[in-house]
Regions:
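Mid-domain alpha/beta scaffold segments of enzyme catalytic cores
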Residues: 1-111
């Protein structure tokens, strides 16, 4: 049977606060062997790292900014983002890019 990886898990969402262990257990029981833990804003980083360290054998993590949060970015935010990347050595950079589906940040803010 093939192994499956979910490369975009938003486990920092409050929706997972009560049953994350069970969610991971069910996924592993269904052959999902790796989880990409996505950091979509710096305010999620502490929670993300706590989750990552609890499930380190099956997770990798990213640090970035989802385009919906582009309106939060300024020079100080970018400085903190670079520091977080340097200190925490994520497996990848992300979220990044453009996303106009819900228009939570304007085109100008995302560019």
């Amino acid at each position: 049977m093939h192994e499956i990886a979910d490369i975009a898990c938003n486990f920092t969402s409050d929706r997972f606060d009560k049953d994350l262990d069970e969610v991971i257990d069910r996924a592993v029981a269904n052959n999902i062997t790796k989880f990409g833990l996505i950091c979509s804003r710096l305010s999620d980083l502490d929670k993300l790292l706590e989750i990552y360290n609890r499930f380190i054998k099956v997770m990798f993590f990213t640090i970035g900014v989802h385009p919906h949060h582009a309106n939060e970015i300024n020079a100080e935010y970018l400085k903190k983002l670079k520091e977080a990347i340097s200190i925490n050595n994520p497996h990848a950079i992300g979220e990044t890019g453009l996303d106009f589906f819900r228009n939570l940040s304007t085109y100008e803010e995302q560019i």
